[in-house]
Swiss-Prot record:
Keyword Membrane recorded: yes
Name of the featured protein: Uncharacterized lipoprotein SAR0444
Covalent lipidation (S-diacylglycerol cysteine), chain numbering: C23
Subcellular location: Cell membrane
Alphabetical list of NCBIfam families matching this protein: SA_tandem_lipo
Residues anchoring lipid (N-palmitoyl cysteine): C23
Gene Ontology CC entries for this record: plasma membrane
KW rRNA-binding (keyword) present: no
Annotated InterPro entries: Csa, Csa_sf
A Pfam family this chain is assigned to: DUF576
Keywords assigned: Cell membrane, Lipoprotein, Membrane, Palmitate, Signal
Signal peptide per UniProt: 1-22
């Protein structure tokens, strides 16, 4: 009789475990599917690449949730930035952040030059210069007169990575280093690329990258894997990552409520 009761208890516990697991399945990522679900989450954004004409974003809808107010068409925020620190030198970054407002059909932002300097006490300080810009006819145009001819030329020739990047081969990236923290939630997948990779070749055409090392591609995001206007999704190509020596390129495309304020 006791044996029958024990068997019945075990069966009941087993049924309960199966029920709880199935109910919670949508919020959990199984070990075998982490990489695949992260790639699928990024694919929703990366499938847009390339957008050769950024003005197409005025008519392109993004992911919407309860954070958007009624009637708000949303704002696309795009950013591309190259960061280089050679041995014995300061870290310097150059890039553009652009807010493409679908309500007003205007696009404004900044060309940003930033230098990170370390003082004698080991404290770091950011020296940042911002040059206001706008987009018209798919071109980045300074809003103020620029004396520095180098900066002026960089702005005139600037292209966002989303305009020439291509991730059609994303599914072919295999055996990535995957991390996932469901409590934050934060997730990432990293892949070793070759210099023959299309996106690597495109970056080398546009930037003077002082190394022949092939980069690693890092897909890093936060928020709900299924989609959310709260959180971020960043792409990073890391060529060199050492103490006192860093070379990497970052890119991001967000779709957010227009009233959100952006710090850059």
């Amino acid at each position: 009789m006791k044996s029958i009761k024990r068997i019945g208890l075990c069966i009941s516990l087993l049924i309960l475990i199966i029920f709880v697991t199935s109910c919670d399945g949508d919020n959990k990522i199984t070990g075998d599917s982490k990489e695949e679900q992260i790639k699928k989450s990024f694919a929703k954004t990366l499938e847009m690449y390339p957008i050769k004409n950024l003005e197409d974003l005025y008519d392109k809808e993004g992911y919407r949730d309860g954070e958007f107010k009624k009637g708000d068409k949303g704002t696309w925020v795009i950013r591309s930035e190259m960061k280089i620190q050679l041995k014995g030198e300061n870290l310097e970054s150059r890039g553009v952040v652009l807010e493409i407002n679908r309500n007003t059909r205007t696009a404004k932002g900044n060309y940003i030059v930033r230098e990170v300097v370390e003082d004698s006490d080991g404290m770091t300080h950011n020296h940042t210069k911002r040059y206001p810009v706008k987009m018209e006819n798919n071109k980045i145009i300074p809003l103020k007169q620029i004396v520095d001819e180098k900066v002026k030329k960089e702005i005139e020739e600037f292209k966002f990575f989303v305009q020439y990047g291509n991730f059609k081969e994303l599914e072919n990236y295999k055996d990535g280093e995957v991390t996932y923290n469901p409590e934050a939630p934060i997730y990432s997948a990293q892949y070793q690329l070759k210099n023959s990779d299309y996106n690597v070749e495109q970056l080398r055409k546009r930037y003077n990258i002082p190394t022949q090392k092939a980069p690693k591609l890092l897909l890093k995001g936060s928020g709900n894997l299924k989609g959310s206007s709260v959180g971020y999704k960043n792409i990073e190509f890391t060529f060199v990552e050492n103490k006192g020596e860093n070379i990497y390129f970052t890119d991001s495309v967000y779709f957010n409520p227009s009233e959100d304020k952006y710090n850059y």
